[in-house]
Amino acid sequence: MLKRSMNIADYDPVLWQAIQDENLRQEEHIELIASENYASPRVMEAQGCQFTNKYAEGYPGKRYYGGCEYADIVEQLAIDRAKALFGADYANVQPHSGSQANAAVYMALLNPGDTILGMSLAHGGHLTHGASVSFSGKIYKAEQYGITSEGLIDYDALRKQAHEVKPKMIVGGFSAYSQIVDWAKMREIADEVGAYLFVDMAHVAGLIAAGVYPSPMPHAHVVTTTTHKTLAGPRGGLILANGNEELYKKLNSAVFPAGQGGPLVHVIAAKAVCFKEALEPEFKTYQAQVVKNAKAMVEVFKQRGYNVVSNGTENHLFLVDLVSHGLTGKAADAALSRANITVNKNAVPNDPQKPFVTSGIRVGTPAVTRRGFNEEDVAELAGWMCDILDSMNKDNHEQVIADTKEKVLAICKRLPVYP
């Protein structure tokens, strides 16, 4: 029999300890991984609700199971809020992840063997944009475009490549590109070769929702995003589109029944909360601060002699190129981690190292901004990071790490994630 008094701590202390340890790690570490963020207690509450128990195959008003009247309310709330947030006529809130949202778009619009043209993973793209190890590079003929030595998209080169390979779809979006993408230019190129323009805005969706980064919605045939990252919601996916009822039918069918069975209604409830939060005025203030903080950190790294790819940032992330300092991304990641600063190693343009080693680190500001860091705080943080990087392979390295960790713990105590 079930009782509301049941809890994990009494039943499974090993698991409970891991949960508590992760809570402490998040509170005592500074999170700079660009794809990570802190969900609100409201979002987490929704994910733990009784909708965990409910199967709801189909869509609102057209389910294959009974007892879905409240699931319909939840899903319709999420759909309506997503459409309002991004200025879309169509939203599918059922994809379990960004990758599954992307897979549904490919399935809806392409046939196996069709050519797609997406940003290379090594140049800042995503696995699902045509990487050889991904379904997107196995099922479809994937061509890749890259960035210049200055870290920018060369639209003339992209146009030339598109005319040469004649893709059925051009994929816009990125996981490690710090500048503004010209969505209108990409649509222009797609139209020239008769291709769909599909944009994966997962990394910048929160910035776009807040109006601090250009929206692809007026230009793309289809847009996808995750609902975590800059949106700060639950881990999940979302598909958006405008002005084409036939396309909407194809997308719905590609999600269910082609790609997924029952939706995760408890996660859709959390998405509804997330979208409501993102429609609030304070969300715009938060996203503007995310960009200000990223720019402030970039300036410190540049002043300290570190090369920032593309020489700056216009969004929530930037890449630090460590080649000239003789450091690897893997070693830098490990050293910073010991001082409770979490980043991720990342390839840089023309990277001489293997993908698991790399010559750079990716730094993002959504999470630190969420816990209250301002420009002064992140500038100080960037200085601490440079201190650690400067000390690598030197006698004072251990002392610098120890000193920095003390400072990190102090600022984390001053600015907790969940006060």
UniProtKB/Swiss-Prot annotation:
Pathway: One-carbon metabolism; tetrahydrofolate interconversion; Amino-acid biosynthesis; glycine biosynthesis; glycine from L-serine: step 1/1
Gene3D superfamilies: Aspartate Aminotransferase, domain 1, Type I PLP-dependent aspartate aminotransferase-like (Major domain)
Catalytic class of the enzyme: transferase
Reaction equation(s) it catalyzes: (6R)-5,10-methylene-5,6,7,8-tetrahydrofolate + glycine + H2O = (6S)-5,6,7,8-tetrahydrofolate + L-serine
Keywords from the UniProt entry: Amino-acid biosynthesis, Cytoplasm, One-carbon metabolism, Pyridoxal phosphate, Transferase
InterPro entries: PyrdxlP-dep_Trfase, PyrdxlP-dep_Trfase_major, PyrdxlP-dep_Trfase_small, Ser_HO-MeTrfase, Ser_HO-MeTrfase-like, Ser_HO-MeTrfase_PLP_BS, SHMT-like_dom
Single Gene Ontology BP annotation: glycine biosynthetic process from serine
EC number(s) recorded for this UniProt protein: 2.1.2.1
One GO location term (cellular component): cytosol
Residues that hold (6S)-5,6,7,8-tetrahydrofolate according to the record: 121, 125-127
Record localization: Cytoplasm
Site (Plays an important role in substrate specificity): 228
PROSITE patterns the UniProt entry points to: SHMT (PS00096)
Gene Ontology MF: a single term: glycine hydroxymethyltransferase activity
Cofactor dependency: pyridoxal 5'-phosphate
Pfam family, one: SHMT
Post-translational modification N6-(pyridoxal phosphate)lysine, affected residues: 229
Superkingdom in the source lineage: Bacteria
Subunit architecture: Homodimer.
PANTHER family from the UniProt entry: SERINE HYDROXYMETHYLTRANSFERASE
Summary of the function given for this chain in its UniProt record: Catalyzes the reversible interconversion of serine and glycine with tetrahydrofolate (THF) serving as the one-carbon carrier. This reaction serves as the major source of one-carbon groups required for the biosynthesis of purines, thymidylate, methionine, and other important biomolecules. Also exhibits THF-independent aldolase activity toward beta-hydroxyamino acids, producing glycine and aldehydes, via a retro-aldol mechanism.
NCBIfam families listed in its UniProt record: PRK00011.1
Entry similarity comment: Belongs to the SHMT family.
Record-given protein name: Serine hydroxymethyltransferase
Gene source species: Histophilus somni (strain 129Pt) (Haemophilus somnus)
